[in-house]
């Protein structure tokens, strides 16, 4: 079968169209990923003057070298752009074989978990205002089996019923049910927009959400989430310095640290890997699926309760 001819400019237009479709469907993160890819690819074809050239395996290799040597982006960023290019190209009827010699996997990044005594130190650290809120949300993420920041930002009051939190992970769409531990309830009560409605700094936040992150709906709400994520990570870096993180051989805190810390502490506490994977809502753990027929949410909740008690975070 003859390979369909697609030019670089046609591919660029298709990437932008996919971004618009995801934006209209309110899949804002995916739309942003396509827009980022479009910006990068547009810079490349403008620099090469190749808008009307055919997109083929040689283009892929040259774009890959451009990202490596001229833009000097990280390897996972190179792979990120190529994956979204490939998805669009294949959707247009192109053959994925043109990408066969390009790196489109994800290289594991170095992650550092917090030891238990640092979690305790964070909990007792005297902080005020937004620093206190971001610290508490970090601890909530840890206690909630490594809940991602995006899931905390969009967590609704209606997701909490009968002593349990039930929500779907934004990343995978997978539903999770988690027992509400006392330490989690305390944080929710402290920072709920309903509790803070008399505070002028928090009075305009959406009362339907658990945390004062989002004021609006749709694209504007997503922009507010992105701003909050940036503020969260910036505050965590400052808090890391205050808590003396360097003394533990660590350099910083980020939104991913709580998730990795829960998994690591759970592993050191003797919790089976299958339970850790299920507790974190992973979607591609093939080996884990073998164990899950007998694994109930109650078992995972029991393990999490034991873990939080073992480090004195109740």
Residue ranges and their predicted role:
Residues 172-193, 204-238:
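C-terminal catalytic core of Y-nucleophile DNA break-rejoin enzymes
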Residues 113, 169-173, 280-305:
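Catalytic-site neighborhood detector that most strongly recognizes the C-terminal catalytic loop/helix
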Residues 195-199, 213-220, 305-314:
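C-terminal secondary-structure termini that scaffold catalytic or DNA-interacting sites
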Residues 129, 233-278:
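Short, basic (Lys/Arg/His-rich) helix/loop patches that form interaction surfaces
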Residues 158-164, 252, 271-291:
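Short, polar N-cap/turn motifs at the start of nucleic acid-interacting alpha helices
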Residues 40-44, 69-100, 145-147:
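N-terminal DNA-binding recognition helix of tyrosine site-specific recombinases/integrases
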Residues 98-149, 153:
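Basic, Lys/Arg- and aromatic-enriched nucleic-acid-binding interface segment
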């Amino acid at each position: 079968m003859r390979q369909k001819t697609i030019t670089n400019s046609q591919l660029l237009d298709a990437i932008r169209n996919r971004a618009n479709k995801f934006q209209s469907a309110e899949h804002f993160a995916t739309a942003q990923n396509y827009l980022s890819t479009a910006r990068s690819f547009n810079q490349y074809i403008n620099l090469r003057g190749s808008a009307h050239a055919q997109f083929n395996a040689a283009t892929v290799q040259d774009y890959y070298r451009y990202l490596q040597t001229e833009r000097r982006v990280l390897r996972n960023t190179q792979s990120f752009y190529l994956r979204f290019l490939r998805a669009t190209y294949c959707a247009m009827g192109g053959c994925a074989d043109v990408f066969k010699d390009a790196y489109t996997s994800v290289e594991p990044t170095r992650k550092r978990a917090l030891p238990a005594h640092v979690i305790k130190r964070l909990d007792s650290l005297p902080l005020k205002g937004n620093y206190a809120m971001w610290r508490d949300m970090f601890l909530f993420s840890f206690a909630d089996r490594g809940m991602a920041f995006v899931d905390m930002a969009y967590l609704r009051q209606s997701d909490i019923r009968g002593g349990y939190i039930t929500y779907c992970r934004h990343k995978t769409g997978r539903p999770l049910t988690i027992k509400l531990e006392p330490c989690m309830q305390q944080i929710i009560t402290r920072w709920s927009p309903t509790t803070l409605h008399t505070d002028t700094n928090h009075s305009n936040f959406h009362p339907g959400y658990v945390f004062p992150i989002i004021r609006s709906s749709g694209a504007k709400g997503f922009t507010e989430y992105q701003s909050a994520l940036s503020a969260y990570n910036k505050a965590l870096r400052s808090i890391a310095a205050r808590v003396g993180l360097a003394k533990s051989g660590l350099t910083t805190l980020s939104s991913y640290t709580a998730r990795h810390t829960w998994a690591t502490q759970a592993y050191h506490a003797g919790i089976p890997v299958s339970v850790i994977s299920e507790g974190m809502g992973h979607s591609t753990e093939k080996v884990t699926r073998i164990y899950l027929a007998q694994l109930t949410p109650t078992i995972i909740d029991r393990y999490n309760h034991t873990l939080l008690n073992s480090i004195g975070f109740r």
